C-alpha cells in the first residue's frame, strides 16, 4: 500500500506484505526492507510459515494493521513513493531475496492509481515479471492485507527476456539493460556475451537488486565515434526462458551534439481531443548522443528559453539515423499513431507548452547550448486539411533549414497523420516532381481464399504537398466506387480495393479503370488511368 489516501476502507497507513512461497519456515530476524534511498532497521525474531503472510510497517501502524493479520514493525520503514519506487528485501546475510521497481502504470487502472488501493502481485510463482504480473487490488476494502491477494491467478511467464538498450559508464565498462530480471549466474557468465570491433570482455557482473542489468568490463578501450554491436546468448529469466531474437544491442561513447547534428524532426502541437503533444528528434550525424543529457524547451513571451525538460531520466543512446520521441502519455500516443519503436518513446511530465497557433521547440545539449530550434506556425500545415487536430508537422529534409516553412509539411493521411519513431511520410528523397501509380496484381479475385483477394494501388511522389482522388469505373464508363477523396500523400504509400462498390456490394467480374487525379496547391496536376481485372473462380 504505497498511497493509502483517499481511504477506501483500510487504515491510512503505508505497508508491505510478504508471502513465504517456499516449502520451509523462514525466520525473518535481521531481514530488511529497502528502497532507492536506504533500508529499514532489522526485522524482529519472526518465523513465517510456508504459504503464509505477514504485514510489514512502521511501529505507529501496527495497532491499526493487526486487525488484518500478523504484523511486524521495523524502524526506518521506507517511505513508499506514490508515483513509483524501487523496493528490495534482503536476508540477514545481505542477500537480495526479491526486488520490484513499481510505477503508476503497474496499477493498470487510472482511478485506482490515484490512491486508496493496493498494488498486488497476480501470480506469486512468477515473481520477476514486473508490470505484467501486477495490478490494482480488487477487494472492496481497497486491498487484501494478510490474506491471499484478490487478484490471485495463474499468470505464467512464457516470454523470452530481451535487451532494451546498453550504455557506457566509461570507455572500458558497459551496462546492458534487459526488459526483466535475468538469472544472476547466467547473467554473470562472460562467454554469454560477444562484441565486435576487436573488443574482448574481461568480466560480467549481474547488478542487484533487480538483476535486470549486467555490467561488462572490457580488456581494451572503446574508440570515439564508433558503434559496437553486442550479442547475448544463453541468458535466461527467473522462469528459465532463454533470450530470443532480441539479443543484439548497439553501444558506443556518446558526445554532446553541436548545432544541427541532431534536429527537430516532427511536432504535434495541436493534438486530438484528449491527446498529447509530442516532439520527435533525429540524429543526422555520424555521432552517438545520450538522451539523458539532452533537453527540450520553448521560449517564453520575452523570448527567453524556458520550461527546460530532460529527454530521458536514464541513459539512452541515439545512434546515427535514430529517432527519439518525447510525450506526456505513451499509451495515448500508441492509440493515436503507429509507433514502430516503443523503446524510443520517453515520457516527460509537463512538456513545455507548444501552443496551437505558433510556438518554439528547442533542443539543448548538456551545456545548455541550442542544438536546433523550430519556430512553427499553424499555417505551416497543409492548407487543404479539413481538420488540423491530431496532424503532426513533419520536417521534409533533415539537412534543410529548421526555420523555413517550406521545409515542413503536414504528415500524410495515408501514414495516419503522424510517424513517431520512424521516417517521416514527407521525407524528401528525390528532386524530380514526377509521380507514379501502379496496381498489383493486374487480375484479382476478391473471394477471400487468401490469394489475390485485393488490388493494391501503390503510389510514389517526389515532393510533398500532393492530394489524391481515385474513382473506379466499369467497362461502360460508369463510376462504381469513389475509393479515395482528397487524401494527403506522403512520398510513397498505397490503398487497397476489395472489389466492392460504394454500397459495399460485390461488383461483377470484368475490366475496371482506376482514374487517379494527383494535384497540389501550386497548380501541378497529374492524371493516371490504370486497368485492373476483377475475376472469380468458377464453382
Question: Where are the regions that the model predicts?
Answer:
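Short loop/turn motifs at secondary-structure boundaries
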Residues: 428-539
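Extracytoplasmic Ser/Thr/Pro-rich, glycosylation-prone low-complexity segments
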Residues: 135-147
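A detector of low-complexity, intrinsically disordered, Ser/Thr/Gly/Pro/Ala-rich segments
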Residues: 20, 417-419, 469
Amino acid at each position: 500500500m504505497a498511497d493509502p489516501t483517499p481511504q477506501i476502507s483500510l487504515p491510512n497507513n503505508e505497508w508491505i506484505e510478504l508471502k513465504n512461497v517456499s516449502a520451509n519456515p523462514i525466520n525473518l530476524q535481521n531481514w530488511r526492507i529497502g528502497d532507492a534511498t536506504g533500508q529499514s532497521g532489522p526485522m524482529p525474531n519472526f518465523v513465517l510459515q510456508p504459504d503464509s503472510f505477514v504485514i510489514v510497517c512502521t511501529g505507529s501502524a501496527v495497532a491499526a494493521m493487526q486487525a488484518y493479520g500478523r504484523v511486524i514493525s521495523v524502524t526506518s520503514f521506507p517511505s513508499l513513493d506514490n508515483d513509483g519506487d524501487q523496493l528490495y528485501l534482503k536476508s540477514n546475510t545481505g542477500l537480495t531475496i526479491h526486488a520490484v521497481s513499481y510505477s503508476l502504470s503497474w496499477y493498470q487502472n487510472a482511478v485506482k492509481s490515484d490512491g486508496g488501493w493496493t498494488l498486488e502481485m497476480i501470480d506469486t510463482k512468477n515473481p520477476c515479471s514486473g508490470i505484467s504480473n501486477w495490478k490494482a487490488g480488487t477487494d472492496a476494502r481497497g486491498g487484501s492485507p494478510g490474506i491471499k491477494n484478490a487478484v490471485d491467478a495463474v499468470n505464467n511467464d512464457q516470454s523470452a527476456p530481451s535487451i532494451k538498450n546498453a550504455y557506457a559508464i566509461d570507455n572500458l565498462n558497459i551496462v546492458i539493460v534487459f526488459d526483466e530480471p535475468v538469472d544472476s549466474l547466467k547473467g554473470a557468465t562472460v562467454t554469454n556475451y560477444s562484441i565486435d570491433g576487436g573488443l574482448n570482455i574481461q568480466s560480467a557482473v549481474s547488478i542487484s537488486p533487480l538483476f535486470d542489468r549486467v555490467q561488462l568490463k572490457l580488456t581494451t578501450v572503446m574508440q570515439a565515434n564508433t558503434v559496437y554491436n553486442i550479442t547475448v546468448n544463453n541468458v535466461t529469466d527467473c522462469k528459465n526462458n532463454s533470450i530470443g531474437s532480441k539479443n543484439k544491442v548497439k553501444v558506443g561513447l556518446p558526445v554532446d551534439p553541436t548545432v544541427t547534428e541532431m534536429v527537430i524532426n516532427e511536432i504535434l502541437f495541436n493534438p486530438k481531443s484528449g491527446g498529447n503533444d509530442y516532439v520527435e528528434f533525429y540524429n543526422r550525424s555520424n555521432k552517438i548522443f545520450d538522451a539523458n543529457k539532452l533537453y527540450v524547451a520553448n521560449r517564453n513571451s520575452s523570448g527567453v528559453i524556458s520550461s527546460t525538460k530532460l529527454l530521458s531520466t536514464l541513459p539512452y543512446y541515439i545512434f546515427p539515423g535514430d529517432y527519439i520521441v518525447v510525450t506526456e502519455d505513451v499509451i495515448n500516443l500508441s492509440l493515436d499513431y503507429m509507433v514502430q519503436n516503443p523503446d524510443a518513446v520517453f515520457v516527460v511530465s509537463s512538456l513545455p507548452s507548444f501552443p496551437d497557433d505558433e510556438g518554439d521547440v528547442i533542443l539543448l545539449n548538456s551545456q545548455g547550448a541550442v542544438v536546433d530550434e523550430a519556430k512553427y506556425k499553424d499555417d505551416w500545415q497543409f492548407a487543404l486539411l479539413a481538420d488540423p487536430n491530431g496532424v503532426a508537422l513533419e520536417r521534409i529534409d533533415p539537412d534543410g533549414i529548421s526555420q523555413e516553412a517550406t521545409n515542413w509539411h503536414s504528415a500524410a493521411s495515408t501514414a495516419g497523420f503522424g510517424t513517431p519513431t520512424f521516417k517521416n511520410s514527407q521525407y524528401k528523397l528525390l528532386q524530380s516532381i514526377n509521380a507514379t501509380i501502379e496496381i498489383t496484381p493486374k487480375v484479382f479475385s476478391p473471394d477471400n481464399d487468401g490469394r489475390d483477394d485485393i488490388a493494391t494501388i501503390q503510389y510514389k511522389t517526389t515532393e510533398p504537398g500532393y492530394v489524391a482522388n481515385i474513382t473506379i469505373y466499369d467497362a461502360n464508363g460508369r463510376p462504381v466506387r469513389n475509393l479515395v477523396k482528397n487524401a494527403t500523400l506522403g512520398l510513397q504509400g498505397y490503398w487497397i480495393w476489395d472489389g466492392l462498390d460504394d454500397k459495399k456490394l460485390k461488383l461483377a467480374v470484368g475490366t475496371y479503370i482506376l482514374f487517379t487525379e494527383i494535384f497540389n496547391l501550386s497548380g501541378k496536376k497529374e492524371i493516371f488511368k490504370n486497368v485492373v481485372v476483377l475475376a472469380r473462380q468458377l464453382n
